[in-house]
Amino acid sequence: MKRFRKNNLSLQQKTTAFVLCLLLLLSTFCTAQIGKRFPSERKVVKDPITGTELIFLTSTPAGDSKIYPTHAQWTADGEWIIFRSNRARNEALAVNEKTGDMVQVTEGGYTGMLCIAQKSMKLYFMRYATGDTSQRRRGGPLEVIEVDLQRVLADSKTGKMKPASTYQRICGTIPEALGAGGDMALDAEEDVVYFRVGKTEADKHIAPGTKIEGAFGPRNMGAGPAGLMQMNTQTGALKYIVSVPFQIGHVQSNPWVSGEIVFCWETGGKSPQRTWTVKSDGTGLRPLYPEADYEWVTHEAVITKDEVAFAIMGHRKIAGADTTGTAVGGANPGQETAWGPSGTREKPTGLAIVNLRTRQMTITGQTPTGSGLWHVHGSPDGRFAVGDDFSRSLYLIDRQTREMRLLTTGHKATAADHPHPTFSTDGKKIQIQSAMLSADGRSMNICIVPVPEDWLKRGSEK
C-alpha cells in the first residue's frame, strides 16, 4: 500500500499556476485601488422638450447613483461630486464637474451613506470592520472612516498614489451589539457623526411605559424601538442621544446649525407621524411637522439653516385605491388600501417647507395633475425649490412668486431609481440621476441641471 501520493505537476505547470494567481491578485488590487482614474464621459445634451442644456457627467451604463438628497453632493471646494458606481463596485467615486475626470476615492468598501464634509475636503462613511473585504456583509462591528479627499485627488492627478491607509483614517469602531445601520450624518462642525442603532440597544434607553409601535402599512415596516447615537470623529468616543418607539430612517443633520438632527419614522410609505427633530444632547425631541391622518408626508430634507422641505403627496384617487398601482420602484407606487385614507388631492398637497424655529409651514407649489411632487429640495439662499414626480420630470419653483417651470423631462419611468433632485450650495444648479441616455431604460447617469439664467437674474434683482 502506498503511503505517499506522488505530485505529478511539472515545474512548468506549477510556474504557470503561480503566475495566474499572481495576475489575478494584481488585477483585483488594481481595480479596487484608491486614486484610480477613469476617462471623462462628460457631455451636454439639450432636453428636446424644454430646451434645457443638461450636463451629463457620466454617460455610459455603469450603474451610477447619486447620494440621497438629505446629504451633501459636492465637495467643500465645489469642484467635485461624490457618487456610487459599478465602475468600482462598492466604492465611492468623484467626478470633476468641469473636466468630467473621475477618481475612485475609497478603498475597502463602505456601507450606507456617504457624508461629504462642507468645511474641509473630507469624506466620512461606515464599513464593516473585518479585514477580509470579501466577508464584509451585514453583521459585525462597524468602523467610521475619514477620507482625506484633498490628498487623494492631488496624488491621483500626479500618478503618485500611496497605500490606502495614507488617505483613510479609522475614526472609531461601533460594536456589533449596538445594531447600528449605515444611516449616518455628519454634524455641521464635522466633529461628530450621528447614526441609527437597533432595537436591543434602543430598548435599554427608552422611557418606561412608552408604547412601542408595531409595523404600519403593507410593507411591514416601521416597528420600534430604535435609537440615535453619535461618535466623535477625533476620539472615537460614543454617546447615546435618544430612543423612539418606532423605526428610524433618513437620519440627517442641519449643515448650518451644529447639534440639530432631523429623521423620520420609516415605514416605506405613509407614516402616522413622518418627520421628527431632536438635539444632539437628546433634548427637544418633537414632530417636525405634525401631520393629519389624511396627509402623506415624505422625503424631508434640510434646505436652509432654518427650513426643511418635504412632500405632501397627492398621488392617489379620492374615491379609493387605484388598482393600476405599481411597486415602489415603478411609475405609480403607494396605491395599496392598507396605507389608509391619505395621499389624495381632497386636501392640500404639494412641496411644503416648514420653519424649524417658528414651526410655520407653507406649500410652495404643486403640479396641477399627475402624481404631484415627490422628492423635493431647495436652494440654501431660499430663492428656489425643486421637485420630481412619478414621470421623472423635474419642476423648478420661484419661492417668491410661486411660479413653477418644467425644467426637464424624459428621464424614463422605467429607471432603476428616482431623480432625487438636490441643489448645489450656490443655488445655481441641481444634481439628478437620470436614465435619459440609457438604452435599457434602467441604468442611470449623473446629471447637472442648471437653473435658467433668466431666473437667476430675476432673483438677484430682488
Per-range role (PLM):
Residues 311-352, 358-403:
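Loop/turn-rich, solvent-exposed surfaces of beta-rich toroidal or solenoidal domains
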Residues 109-226, 242-243:
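Asp-box/WD-like beta-propeller blade repeats and closely related beta-sheet repeat scaffolds
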Residues 82-88, 124-138, 146-149, 194-200, ...:
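Beta-strand C-termini and the immediately following turn/loop, strongest in propeller blades
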